[in-house]
From Swiss-Prot:
GO terms for biological process: phosphate-containing compound metabolic process. The lineage of its organism: Bacteria, Bacillati, Cyanobacteriota, Cyanophyceae, Synechococcales. GO terms for cellular component: cytoplasm. Keywords: Cytoplasm, Formylation, Hydrolase, Magnesium, Metal-binding. Belongs to the PPase family. In the presence of Zn(2+) ions, activity is 13% of maximum, in the presence of Mn(2+), Cu(2+), Fe(2+) or Co(2+) ions, activity is very low. In the absence of metal ions, there is no activity. The modification N-formylmethionine is found at M1. This is Inorganic pyrophosphatase. Mg(2+) 2 binds at D69. Its main location: cytoplasm. InterPro entries: Pyrophosphatase, Pyrophosphatase_sf.
């Protein structure tokens, strides 16, 4: 898979998210650049599972040295390697392993059920709480600590994506 062919921002206001982990999975897959395929990184130690499809924005480099993370709210899970053109609606800021780590929350651009969702404020607060709780607790049994800093709305996302695209280049 040639990731260089997948633009981070295919159109203004949209991003591409390459899915590594489908919703409902306890398996944490990661794209292995050396093998050029998806590989099982680990199985989550705790009883939680990924609430939505999770992956990364290709051709970006975040402060933690990895591509920028993205989570796409979907009604049905996709699969590792699926590229979803998505509309970012906000981001969860957290600390993971001592490093700042942002999780970009998105909705699929090609799903009419989410055309009204433009911001995290368009979602039920409980949904955001569930996502934050997942990231707060998913590493507990590994004796790793994550700290949730809070949610930022959509206006904070695109400048971060643009910065991470520049960092990659």
């Amino acid at each position: 898979m040639d990731l260089s062919r997948i633009p981070a921002q295919p159109k203004a206001g949209l991003i591409n998210v390459l899915i590594e982990i489908p919703a409902g999975s306890k398996n944490k897959y990661e794209f292995d650049k050396d093998m050029n395929c998806f590989a099982l990184d680990r199985v989550l130690y705790s009883s939680v599972q990924y609430p939505y499809d999770y992956g990364f924005i290709p051709n970006t480099l975040a402060d933690d040295g990895d591509p920028l993370d993205g989570m796409v709210i979907m009604d049905q899970p996709t699969f590792p390697g699926c590229v979803i053109t998505a509309r970012p609606i906000g981001m969860l800021e957290m600390i993971d392993g001592g490093d700042r780590d942002e999780k970009i929350l998105c909705v699929p651009a090609k799903d009419p059920r989410y055309t009204y969702v433009k911001s995290i404020n368009d979602l039920a607060g409980h949904r955001l709480d569930e996502i934050a709780e997942f990231f707060r607790s998913y590493k507990n049994l590994e004796k790793k600590v994550t700290e949730i800093l809070g949610w930022k709305d959509v206006d904070a996302v695109l400048p971060l994506v643009e910065e991470c695209v520049k960092n990659y280049k």
